[in-house]
């Protein structure tokens, strides 16, 4: 997919870089797989802000994406078209099964219209096919990896994402994630062969603040620009630094401080991710 720089007809378009994919469907999405999506603007049921820097943005439907792919084993399918999805960084593919049913799945790297796909333990080792990890060769690049069997893919789902199957030991397999973390998963969990497509998504330049507002992202104000009542970094005469270890608005250290508290799954992590 080529990157396109826009002509500098305005300050906002001067540095804008877009990812252009001529293979994407230019019409409307498949209506039976759409659901309404209501803007929460980062608020909970009491109207209190629980996630900062969210609000506004263009209204859009949710595309129902099949992350499980476990109830059509052995039924061949074909890629009908590739589509843009405003809810995720990756593109999605509309596939049609031999029995006529249509579903959305994340589009793998190199996926083309008309490509044949299959899921199940008998599926060939080919990009876009979904298999249990026990049937995938060691060393394969995979994406859309399940952590719990039957729950659906939870790992390596964003644009350009992937993982590597390192080994199988008994009922567990070891998978290395992009972060460098090595994690154990049950061999009954499923994964898709290949990488997630739209890998150039990280190279785009939005060009102007308004483009983020279209996406529902509000401005982020620095703590040192606030008052002491609003942030631990706030206050001071003139321009001042934090004067302490950088922390969040609630006092938690923000740079390199480990906040993981899920002891239940700690035993599944063989090697923690590398420090950057």
Curated annotation (Swiss-Prot):
Disulfide bonds: none annotated. Gene3D superfamilies: 2.30.30.30, Nucleic acid-binding proteins (2.40.50.140), Ribosomal protein L2, domain 3 (4.10.950.10). GO terms for cellular component: large ribosomal subunit. It comes from the Bacteria. Pfam families: Ribosomal_L2, Ribosomal_L2_C. One of the primary rRNA binding proteins. Required for association of the 30S and 50S subunits to form the 70S ribosome, for tRNA binding and peptide bond formation. It has been suggested to have peptidyltransferase activity; this is somewhat controversial. Makes several contacts with the 16S rRNA in the 70S ribosome. Belongs to the universal ribosomal protein uL2 family. HAMAP family: Ribosomal_uL2_B. This is Large ribosomal subunit protein uL2. It comes from Polynucleobacter asymbioticus (strain DSM 18221 / CIP 109841 / QLW-P1DMWA-1) (Polynucleobacter necessarius subsp. asymbioticus). The lineage of its organism: Bacteria, Pseudomonadati, Pseudomonadota, Betaproteobacteria, Burkholderiales. The gene is rplB.
